[in-house]
Amino acid sequence: MQYRRFGRTNLQMPVFSCGGMRYQFQWQDVPMSQIPDENQGNLEAIINKSLEVGINHIETARGYGTSEMQLGKILPQLPRDKIIVQTKVSPGQDVREFRRKFEQSLQFLRLDYVDLLGIHGINTAEILDDTMAEGGCWQEAKKLQQQGKVRFIGFSTHAPTDVIVKTIATNCYDYLNLHWYYIFQNNWLAIEAAKQHDMGVFIISPSDKGGHLYNPPPKLVALCSPLSPMVFNDLFCLSHPAVHTLSIGAARARDFDEHLKTLPLLDRAEKILPAIIERLQGEMINCLGDNWVKTWSLGLPSWENTPNHINIRSILWLRNLAIAYDMIDFAKARYNLLGNGGHWFPGQQAKEVEKLDLTACLAASPHADKIPHLLAETHRLLSGETVQRLSSS
């Protein structure tokens, strides 16, 4: 395993982390007596494999159902100074509820403290304002830190980049968890801002939200050859020193194996990556046109400023991936989450977009004339059965 300094925490963070939202029994709290021995045994095998390969950062959340309770059966048996434990708690206007949830997390984990507490889901400017308000959840997290129950405070986010940068600019957080990977590089400005504030940077879900890379289409496999799409994406992310760790949401012990193939390649990333990136970029241009690839995202409105709250940017992004890389299954899964993703994946589908007048909201786009047609086309291509967030399903 390789390790990187996790920003101003000074923790030596493994470049891969063991994410805790895939191995738990279910998404709702239930008594430990209801958890099958087979499921608990699988979780413990995952943690043991993680530690065996040097991944000593174990990440979970109060919102991950039985994850914390199940971890509490194994974590107290481990040398406390050899593991890094992170949990996350969603903020709200009731700080007493925030504290109650955190205390429940600590009780389930059977630990005296966590190394990292993430304020979970600073996804909008309103949530940020509420969190940072006098007497808000950030101040409550600081009290927990002063009481020795938390070592470092961070935040996790699915927010637009400007909200992430604004959160970083408070200089109140030691680290952040965010989305950034090859197919979604929008948040690079946030990573640069985090570097300026010496914050730890944890990449959320690079293999799932990064393209369902555990089940890639043959075309993407060919474009990423000789690496698998998963290893390519890992190497791409970790080739940037400002990125410190990638989450592996393991559902079974063998889920680490493919990721570990990245480690011996890290020193040669600058020689390996350019040819693959050139192929990927070239195929995007070949399928969609050079002008579109360079300018499609210019002048697009936010979903809040679009009739029917259509998330134009996300829909066109998914269309690009589906057409250029045959990432149909991934694009369908994300598209059909629109309307059910809340502030984690906001906005609506392009249903009946033909009946809407998008002229005003697309006035700044160089492709205003064709985007309505493309949205309708994408809806026909991707619409299907409604998808819910994992924690809601």
Regions found by a protein language model. Give the residues of each.
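Hydrophobic packing residues within well-ordered alpha-helices of enzyme cores
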Residues: 71-74, 163-167, 256-259
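Conserved, mostly hydrophobic/aromatic
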Residues: 6, 16-18, 50, 58, ...
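Short beta->alpha linker loops
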Residues: 62, 66, 90, 158-159, ...
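Glycine/proline-rich, positively charged
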Residues: 27-35, 48, 93-191, 195-207, ...
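Alpha-helix-loop-beta-strand connector modules within alpha/beta enzyme cores
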Residues: 68-87, 137-148, 202-203
